[in-house]
């Protein structure tokens, strides 16, 4: 029973390290080992989900010392649901558009490290080796901080490898990741990694849109183009 805080700390740090590095690892895996991407994705999600699932029973067992059992379950699950709601809204609307996928993952990892550090201070008297736990928090924090600082470089490496051709433009808008490549085969436009335009065969797409309208009108002198990007 006295080791419950230590178990909670270990799980929290594993969630921070694995969950925080998950987007970066998947970015690199998709670029360098695409055949193993699905297995790595499902495996890491399964591990993180299992660890997060273990946290709630541990928190309940720790809090039952000070909270009545009739109120404990409702309070823990309420905060769990509220936290999940806040994250599900902040992730697509605020964090990813401003931080990007890699930095967003690292940000949540840093939040887990902060929770672990707070737990070290809170349960310091019950931990057999609180200094070792504090050192582990510092080590995980350092790894995630390096990932945060190197996020742009990791993204560049992964995209250069994934697209093959030279990347001439890469931008993240509030809605999508825009990448333009140029190579011997022509210019390509990708939105969120999906091919949208290729200079080699774009005429097929545009001719199908333009010719029927032009033929129906005859000989237009003024043309209004809507959404012609």
Regions found by a protein language model. Name each.
Residues 1-229:
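Alpha-helical transmembrane segments of multi-pass membrane proteins
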